Regions:
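Conserved acidic donor-binding segment of nucleotide-sugar-dependent glycosyltransferases
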Residues: 313-314, 318-325, 334-339
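Short hydrophobic beta-strand element within catalytic cores of glycosyltransferases
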Residues: 298-301
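Aromatic "clamp/platform" in nucleotide-sugar-dependent glycosyltransferases that forms part
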Residues: 281
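Short alpha-helical donor nucleotide-sugar binding micro-motif in glycosyltransferases
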Residues: 154, 262-263, 269-273
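Membrane-proximal helix-turn-helix segments that form the acceptor-binding/catalytic region
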Residues: 78-86, 99-101, 120, 135-159
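Acceptor-binding helix/loop patch of EC 2.4 sugar-transfer enzymes
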Residues: 56-67, 108-148
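Nucleotide-activated donor-binding/catalytic signature segment of Leloir-type glycosyltransferases, i.e.
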Residues: 245-263
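Conserved donor-binding/catalytic core segment of Leloir-type glycosyltransferases
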Residues: 186-187, 192-225, 234
């Protein structure tokens, strides 16, 4: 079985490729990223480099790029891969950059699977519009042609890989039957030592990027409402909050909030925290939650964070609705006041993370890929005739 995977950057493609290899597939990845950036990728997996000047400029020169340019780059990358993709059995493409390659791969005998970590494009755009208003910035909708490309990918795919029920539930009911839930748990390091004792200054941490999706606004509102003595909030992000009036104004009022930039070892950041929070408005999975849990840090997450679906709220974490500063403040206050609860939840969190997989093992994800392959094997090919002979992969 020959499987082609296309992704502009590594993302979780090493986990996908490794899972496919475990199930007996021969895998080739097409990407604009060199192989050295694909950590822990099985040696048997081949990689075809499809250059992208824009991706290179973003990575090496840290050149700021507009959304319009990114949309155009995904189109160009997709058509570049379509020109070189080899005949095979299955093509798995990353959402928004796979439509042309899907057509080419299907003409050459492959079946198309879409990898979509984020919610349905219409759901996500509605959320972005609402959050733009809350943060005080103009809403910039995706161009119509880019939306249509994504809708066409959904329709064209035989199956869609999604990391959570949260993502799956945003799709139309008629489409949910072809979505396979594949939790992105599998890149979680377990430090030999942790720091379960409470710090002299009660420290809450959060990790994330895009302010429109990560719920920082509600966390800052909760933090300001609490006004806890001897407490500090650490925000690990590369985002520039000065571009968002709603965030900028709150940060000016809060002296006990620090923005943390590059951290050589993210485990060091987690172990500075007494509590970790993912206040996400939109997070298809959110692996940072389990990274913190592996460091024996009790966590609070919203139900719009896909990884929260693996928690038992009140035992190994606290799950709250998104966009609710009041409930977030209550959850933080309970862990601030009740040290026994905080310690018990921290221990249970690490145990849950260990039970789900250690040292890059990913049993939940591997099982989901097995389900995908079984579904394809049990469904007859209808979209394209198989080629008479396979060329060398």
């Amino acid at each position: 079985m020959h499987v082609a995977v296309s992704t502009t950057r590594p993302f979780h493609s090493p986990m996908l490729a490794n899972a496919l290899v475990k199930h007996g597939a021969r895998v080739r990845i097409y990407s604009s990223a060199p192989r050295r950036y694909f950590r822990r990728l099985d040696e048997s997996v081949r990689l075809t480099l499809v250059p992208s000047l824009l991706q290179a400029a973003m990575h090496f020169a840290h050149v700021p790029v507009s959304q319009k340019a990114l949309h155009a780059d995904s189109w160009l990358y997709d058509h570049s891969v379509a020109a070189v993709v080899r005949p095979g059995d299955i093509f798995i493409g990353w959402a928004s950059a796979s439509l042309a390659t899907a057509h080419a791969a299907k003409r050459r005998g492959a079946r198309f699977v879409l990898d979509r970590a984020c919610p349905h494009v219409d759901f996500q755009q509605q959320m972005v519009e609402q959050e733009s208003a809350a943060l005080g910035i103009p809403y910039q909708p995706q161009p119509a042609w880019f939306r249509e490309r994504q809708l066409a990918e959904y329709a064209e795919a035989e199956r869609i890989l999604a990391p959570s029920e949260y993502t799956r539930a945003t799709f139309p009911e008629a489409m949910r039957g072809k979505i396979i839930k594949a939790p992105l748990f599998g890149r979680c390091a377990f430090p030999a030592t942790t720091h379960p004792d409470r710090h002299a200054e009660f420290t809450v941490g959060v990790v994330g990027g895009e302010p429109l999706r990560k719920g920082y606004l509600y966390l800052l509102d909760a933090w300001e409402r609490l006004a806890l003595p001897d407490a500090r909030l650490l925000i690990r992000t590369d985002a520039d909050f000065t571009h968002y009036p709603g965030l900028r104004e709150r940060l000016l009022r809060l002296s006990n909030v620090d923005i943390v930039r590059y951290v050589p070892d993210i485990n060091d950041f987690y172990q500075r925290c007494d509590v970790f929070v993912l206040p996400s408005v939109d997070d298809g999975f959110g692996m940072a939650l389990f990274e913190a849990m592996a460091n024996e840090v009790p966590c609070i997450a919203t139900s719009h964070c896909g990884s929260s679906e693996l928690l038992t709220s009140g035992r190994d974490g606290i799950v709250i609705p998104p966009r609710n500063a009041e409930l977030l403040a209550e959850a933080l206050l309970s862990l601030y006041r009740q040290e026994d609860l905080r310690r018990t939840m921290a221990s249970a969190a690490r145990a849950t993370a260990a039970a789900l997989g250690k040292d890059d093992s990913s049993p939940l994800y591997d099982a989901a890929i097995g389900t995908l392959l079984d579904c394809l094997a049990s469904t007859p090919v209808t979209a394209a005739k198989r080629p008479a002979a396979m060329t060398k992969y």
